[in-house]
């Protein structure tokens, strides 16, 4: 109400912001676009007027974005294979538009570039008069190195490896940004050590209130996009190293599982695979599970599925790479030794998630993982 009155009578100056997104951020159905969509929503609710620019490659135009933005523009991503021959990373050179550049240059509003992917024009002279900020979602060359190590196909492995080298060199473009909003504490430490002007602004997400159910569930859940090599490896690890040693039931939920994963599931009577499943159905499984088990072997950025599990689920188990330096360690059962993982499973599977557990988990609502907290931090950085 206070914002409305001030805005109506021009008591405060309207804040306007260009956001350049690497993809159309709706539906908010994977890590990167979840952060972008709920950031846009939070900024809109805080009174920031957003001019959104989206690179598009296979996702539909999203009219819902117009509810939160004063203008929305779409730009076709250039997927020409000739771009692979350039020194600029393909994920960057394929997101380049003169029309976008001209629109950005036409006013004095600040710009938030979403990810290193969108930074091809960061140092362009046409926008040197503008305040420019970058939201980093990963240390991209580390992320691509991890993808390369996790990939079994030679052609993809080679692509990720070459892209990682190019991204490491391209990263220096960040010197042209007035500020960087790093998604994780580890990324923030790295960027500041490199001399970039970075602050930690954690991931934006769909959760505002803890919605965990008390009582017991009757299965353990692992969820993730199974087409991503990192998640495929984590699911196989659980099957081969943990659930082969216990009869506790496991559900693996996620689309596009590999043939190898399907074969492994068929060998384990206590494991079920749900692979034609919507986000809404996954959230229901997160809520119903007794334990959400989320290991990772790629400690980059912050895993939004961990936040989802903590806001919506009962007990959460993870390895140290999933939670290291996140501030979420105290809310999880953290273990790296597989024998102790099995012991913890058999202990917590029969425990009540009680009122005291629920109240303890509620601390997250008012922490650095709340959207309102991070929105204020971002506004302070940009304006």
Where are these regions (language model features)?
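Donor nucleotide-sugar binding/catalytic pocket of nucleotide-sugar-dependent glycosyltransferases
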Residues: 160-210
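Conserved catalytic-core segment of nucleotide-activated headgroup transferases in glycan assembly
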Residues: 35, 203-264, 273-283, 287
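Active-site proximal beta-strand in glycosyltransferases
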Residues: 128-150
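Short hydrophobic beta-strand element within catalytic cores of glycosyltransferases
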Residues: 305-311, 315-319
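A charged, aromatic-enriched C-terminal amphipathic alpha-helix characteristic of glycosyltransferases
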Residues: 95-98, 350-383
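Membrane-proximal helix-turn-helix segments that form the acceptor-binding/catalytic region
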Residues: 99-105, 139-143, 151-180
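Acidic donor-binding loop of glycosyltransferase active sites
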Residues: 286-301, 312-314
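N-terminal subdomain of nucleotide-sugar transferases
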Residues: 2-70, 106-107, 244
């Amino acid at each position: 109400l206070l914002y409305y009155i001030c805005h109506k009578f021009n008591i405060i100056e309207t804040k306007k912001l260009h956001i350049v997104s690497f993809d159309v951020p709706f539906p908010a159905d994977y890590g990167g676009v979840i952060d972008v969509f709920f950031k846009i929503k939070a900024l809109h609710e805080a009174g920031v007027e957003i001019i959104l620019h989206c690179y598009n490659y296979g996702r539909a135009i999203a009219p819902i974005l117009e509810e939160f933005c004063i203008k929305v523009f779409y730009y076709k991503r250039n997927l020409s294979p000739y771009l692979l021959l350039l020194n600029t990373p393909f994920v960057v050179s394929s997101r380049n538009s003169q029309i976008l550049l001209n629109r950005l240059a036409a006013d004095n509003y600040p710009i938030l570039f979403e990810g290193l992917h969108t930074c091809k024009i960061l140092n362009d002279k046409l926008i040197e008069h503008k305040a420019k900020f970058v939201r980093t979602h990963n240390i991209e060359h580390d992320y691509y190195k991890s993808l390369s190590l996790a990939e079994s196909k030679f052609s993809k492995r080679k692509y990720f490896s070459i892209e990682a080298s190019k991204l490491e060199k391209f990263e220096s473009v960040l010197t042209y940004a007035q500020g960087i909003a790093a998604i994780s504490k580890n990324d923030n430490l790295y960027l500041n050590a490199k001399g970039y002007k970075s602050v930690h602004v954690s991931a934006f997400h769909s959760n505002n209130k803890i919605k965990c159910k008390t009582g017991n569930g009757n299965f353990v859940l692992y969820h993730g996009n199974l087409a991503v090599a990192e998640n495929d490896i984590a699911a196989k690890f659980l099957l081969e190293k943990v659930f082969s040693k216990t009869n506790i039931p496991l559900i693996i939920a996620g689309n596009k599982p590999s043939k190898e994963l399907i074969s492994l599931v068929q060998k384990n009577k206590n494991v079920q695979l749900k692979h034609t499943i919507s986000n809404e159905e996954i959230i229901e499984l997160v809520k119903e599970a007794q334990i959400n088990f989320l290991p990772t072997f790629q400690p980059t950025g912050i895993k939004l599925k961990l936040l989802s599990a903590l806001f919506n689920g009962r007990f959460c188990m993870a390895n140290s790479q999933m939670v290291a330096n996140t501030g979420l360690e105290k809310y999880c059962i953290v273990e790296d030794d597989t024998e102790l993982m099995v012991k913890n499973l058999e202990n917590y599977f029969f425990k009540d998630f009680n009122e005291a557990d629920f109240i303890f988990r509620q601390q997250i609502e008012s922490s650095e993982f709340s959207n309102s907290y991070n929105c204020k931090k971002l506004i302070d950085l940009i304006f």
